[in-house]
Curated annotation (Swiss-Prot):
HAMAP family noted in UniProt: Ribosomal_bS20 (MF_00500)
One cellular-component annotation, GO: small ribosomal subunit
Official protein name in the record: Small ribosomal subunit protein bS20
Any GO MF annotation of the entry: structural constituent of ribosome
Organism: Polaromonas sp. (strain JS666 / ATCC BAA-500)
Amino acid sequence: MATAKPKKKNPRLASGRKRVRQDTKLNAANTSLRSKYRTAVKNVEKAVAAGDKDKAKDLFAKAQSIVDIVADKGIFHKNKAARDKSRLSAKVKALALAPAKAA
């Protein structure tokens, strides 16, 4: 059984109330970007798994942009973003170099 968290008290100071409002907005924006990042990476990996070279290249180009945006905003560390881009790039390049499958 899940236990409900005790409700937090509202801040008394105006600056504290403003901080709560700002944090809520930032949390929503960060969650949205994080989701977009994961979706972009997942789409590239699906295209690679399907063996679709052109689609994988196009999706990888879009994913790179999203990964850079997320790293610049500090949602994910820049080294994690670089590592993910590198791994995706290696998968796309391996797909491009692989001989075409007989259909």
